[in-house]
Amino acid sequence: MTLTIKEVTQLINAVNTIEELENHECFLDERKGVQNAIARRRKALEKEQALKEKYVEMTYFENEILTENPNAIICGIDEVGRGPLAGPVVACATILNSNHNYLGLDDSKKVPVTKRLELNEALKNEVTAFAYGIATAEEIDEFNIYKATQIAMQRAIDGLSVQPTHLLIDAMTLDNALPQVSLIKGDARSVSIAAASIMAKVFRDDYMTQLSKDYPEYGFEKNAGYGTKQHLLAIDDIGIMKEHRKSFEPIKSLL
């Protein structure tokens, strides 16, 4: 008895590798519906394989440290919010567990919102330790954004419940005695930094969404404090509020 296209599709969708797909008895079924199902499954498997390969690439720096010190406790650190006109700069320090596997981890700006939220929940529930650090708009104005970012990162490290032995940091160096590696575009090169990037992004977006409830005119729930047209028009219309960065243009010139 010939299987229906629906039945064959169910069999195809249960296949876990491209090799298995190509050797499947249904592979030679010439019905268009079956061939379409095979093409869709191949595309999905190729995408999954690419994510696996990227994940392995992004463990390079962690593995380098673990080769020298198998007992190393590696902390990834990243920040979000250096560019906005309002709100804090937020850092996250994250220590992944030893059997981590979060396919799709990447620079938080490249990860779709739904996937970002999914990864954030998994990370919060499963990592060995994580902590956030915040530097306020007032501190950004007092020290400058670079120094404020360092302050936020160190606060995140200080908040960890587990003491790390090594730091992997996105494009920054810290005044910290622990061994550290600063990586340009680290959130796309290290799983530890990428995890911190995701968590910091979700935390700050939530913070700005809450802030928008008190200051709806600025549209913080949509722009996260960046200088969008709506945001700039609101500043022209009603002025600034306490979480605007007075050292940032165009606000600085308005004061």
Curated annotation (Swiss-Prot):
Listed EC numbers: 3.1.26.4
Any Pfam family hit: RNase_HII
Gene Ontology molecular function: any one: RNA-DNA hybrid ribonuclease activity
Catalytic activity field: Endonucleolytic cleavage to 5'-phosphomonoester
Gene3D superfamilies: Ribonuclease H-like superfamily/Ribonuclease H
Subcellular location: Cytoplasm
Biological processes, Gene Ontology terms: DNA replication, removal of RNA primer; mismatch repair
Record-linked InterPro entries: RNase_HII (IPR022898), RNase_HII/HIII (IPR001352), RNase_HII/HIII_dom (IPR024567), RNaseH-like_sf (IPR012337), RNaseH_sf (IPR036397)
SUPFAM superfamilies: Ribonuclease H-like
CDD domains referenced in this protein's UniProt entry, alphabetically: RNase_HII_bacteria_HII_like
Family from the record: Belongs to the RNase HII family.
Function: Endonuclease that specifically degrades the RNA of RNA-DNA hybrids.
Protein name: Ribonuclease HII
